[in-house]
């Protein structure tokens, strides 16, 4: 079983635009590309954890589930959205 944490659903991208990656030139990635969410976003992390918890509650005892992938093809992307910049500034202190 997999979660959609690598590519959040379109409703999440539209309702919470602050979860989207932002490039150095200020371009915000939109839904339609893979891995467009910012792991630095507290909103994204909260919603991802909630989704994982709900799936675990629903499928946790299902004997047909033999494995669970929480993310798919994690990658490193440069991220300049507000949450990433704030976290980096805090790290530098």
Language model: regions and residue ranges:
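Active-site mouth of glycoside hydrolases
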Residues: 1-93
